[in-house]
Amino acid sequence: MWRLKIAEGGNDPYLFSTNNFVGRQTWEYDPEAGSEEERAQVEEARRNFYNNRFEVKPCGDLLWRFQVLRENNFKQTIGGVKIEDEEEITYEKTTTTLRRGTHHLATLQTSDGHWPAQIAGPLFFMPPLVFCVYITGHLDSVFPPEHRKEILRYIYCHQNEDGGWGLHIEGHSTMFCTALNYICMRILGEGPDGGEDNACVRARNWIRQHGGVTHIPSWGKTWLSILGVFDWLGSNPMPPEFWILPSFLPMHPAKMWCYCRLVYMPMSYLYGKRFVGPITPLILQLREELHTEPYEKINWTKTRHLCAKEDIYYPHPLIQDLIWDSLYIFTEPLLTRWPFNKLVRKRALEVTMKHIHYEDENSRYLTIGCVEKVLCMLACWVEDPNGDAFKKHIARVPDYLWISEDGMTMQSFGSQEWDAGFAVQALLATNLIEEIKPALAKGHDFIKKSQVTENPSGDFKSMHRHISKGSWTFSDQDHGWQVSDCTAEGLKCCLLLSLLPPEIVGEKMEPERLFDSVNLLLSLQSKKGGLAAWEPAGAQEWLELLNPTEFFADIVVEHEYVECTGSAIQALVLFKKLYPGHRKKEIENFIFNAVRFLEDTQTEDGSWYGNWGVCFTYGSWFALGGLAAAGKTYTNCAAIRKGVKFLLTTQREDGGWGESYLSSPKKIYVPLEGNRSNVVHTAWALMGLIHAGQSERDPTPLHRAAKLLINSQLEQGDWPQQEITGVFMKNCMLHYPMYRDIYPLWALAEYRRRVPLP
């Protein structure tokens, strides 16, 4: 059986940590573990998921839950309640629901104080990792038979009915993910006619019916060129000389969004080297299977701008294609020939590799995320197959792997700090302090130990990095990358917990460390008043015209985000109340400008676009929370009135809310089909209305929402897993299984606290 290990580094000499691996979560397979009953429980969960995979596509993250509930001997001893038609909700029944949810949520916590969970959903995360270890000769050591079995299970579970795979688990089939997952199956041992439910044949038919892999998007062209299934001549240029451009140019790396910068950094190294892995018999077979004409006859120059229509979310503007054509026709032939290959290209590759090593070392070889991780790992191997850098990368691969009832996938990276911050706030909101003292103390300890206490090493500005001291990351301290909303939520948790006796929740965080967090937040506000997520926004918006991806939008430069802004307002308002003398004027100006940003970014229908959750419901919750914290009310703020109107008009007949993931790419509100409600959306909307003072005007919509949440609670005290609720870059969804535990509980806690009940 599979077991999740917490905060363990083992004795691997290539592993190192800044805080003794607090927050680390790694799965291990133990063939001797588990009773017959436990194994049967896991198999039943797997079977149920597969049989219902087209109805509910996100997993329930059950393997970890089975383990932790069993280890903690959890049994729900508090009886459930239901609210009948025409029945009035009482304080007592709400409290019973809260107690059941609180006990369950507290039991899901680990020994180091965080709440482990999957954070995945995109179907292009795992295949490149498989490609990388295949190319480098480490496939068998990184993915032994049980790993391969679970990776294949995940691929089969998320294959669409038409034979393809979507960009994410709920998406329509795309060439990018269908080709990647097909190759992944073949590398893991499936024959051309193999796979569950004829998976390989169905996938290959989909690929060939849509023009073959010459129509794969640019990221796919890169990976297939690395494998040798494609030719680098069929890719648009990614010159490493980009890394030696003078800083005054608008296209300098320092002006790029960090994720874009750190994806194209190792890509440009591999492109500059024109690296191709070993041409094995399997690679030769794949050339035959995936192209619609003989490999030797393909006109690679004509494939550069080909892309299947199913993959296109952001069509390249003409100016971009002209730039790529110019680089392809004029620049690359020069840079790859003497003397420029020695004078310029060699220097560019050295500088690029210097940046790769810097980013690796400052993230303890986790890197900023899974796409970058695999590319940087491969670049290190290309530079030195026996070097320590590659070995350190291999040691951190387990940090990215996650097992659920739908199989093994690769995480975007962990959401440990993100989930912990909201879980702690939800528990605090219940006011059931006496019943959850250990959970609060452990959560507090985890949050304190996870704060980043240093800036990136050395002259970090010359490496295009921003300050990180005082921040919280999305995952753990080792990751090292500051995020504004994670910092705001971490700061808020520490401030709220400081109001409780230390004998219950532990010693409060030192003021200097809180001041560091405030400094980080203040540094990330833009001239527009909004908050960027990772680094200050301010680069020219027209640079988005150069977005080289086909399936993401707004990835070239950093932007301001509603959620980050709303979180920061709430944290700084609370900080100002508890530390009124610290940078008072700066904080007041920050809040004033942040409120202006929220008012300016409200849409015509009264909602706010959510960048990291689905979608207008999510954004509206953060915006209304920020406005209310800043002292705005329904009476004195038109934005709040419009926001309330939006939420009330989108409430369903059953009292809930349900928003389709399609809202995010389409940028208009799209309800779930069939008038379905989603408990997470319902919780966000309920809290948004409570922030806006709805209970003082007409509490009926709040009662209807609370009724749905109370009646949706499951036997153990959690809530059902429904549609996916996370998103990034407008067009790709992320699955957060902990959301179904945290947000309904938090919303009902706020409901009980703010709405008069009999």
Swiss-Prot record:
Q: Where are the PFTB repeats?
A: 148-189, 514-556, 591-631, 640-681
Q: Which InterPro entries match?
A: SQ_cyclase_C (IPR032696), SQ_cyclase_N (IPR032697), Squalene_cyclase (IPR018333), Terpene_synthase_CS (IPR002365), Terpenoid_cyclase/PrenylTrfase (IPR008930)
**UniProt GO molecular function:** beta-amyrin synthase activity
Q: Which UniProt keywords apply?
A: Isomerase, Repeat
Q: Does the keyword Isomerase apply?
A: yes
Record-annotated active site: 485
Of the GO CC terms on this record, one is:
lipid droplet
Provide the GO biological process annotations: triterpenoid biosynthetic process
- Name the source's superkingdom: Eukaryota
In terms of PROSITE patterns, this protein maps to: TERPENE_SYNTHASES
Q: Does the keyword RNA-binding apply?
A: no
Q: Any idea of its EC number?
A: 5.4.99.39
Enzyme class name = isomerase
The reaction(s) annotated as catalysed by this protein in its Swiss-Prot or TrEMBL entry are: (S)-2,3-epoxysqualene = beta-amyrin
Job of this protein:
Oxidosqualene cyclase converting oxidosqualene into beta-amyrin, generating five rings and eight asymmetric centers in a single transformation.
Q: Which family does it belong to?
A: Belongs to the terpene cyclase/mutase family.
Give the matching NCBIfam families.
Answer: squalene_cyclas (TIGR01787)
Q: Which PANTHER family match?
A: BETA-AMYRIN SYNTHASE-RELATED, TERPENE CYCLASE/MUTASE FAMILY MEMBER
Q: What is this protein called?
A: Beta-amyrin synthase
Q: Which organism is it from?
A: Pisum sativum
- Give the classification, highest ranks: Eukaryota, Viridiplantae, Streptophyta, Embryophyta, Tracheophyta
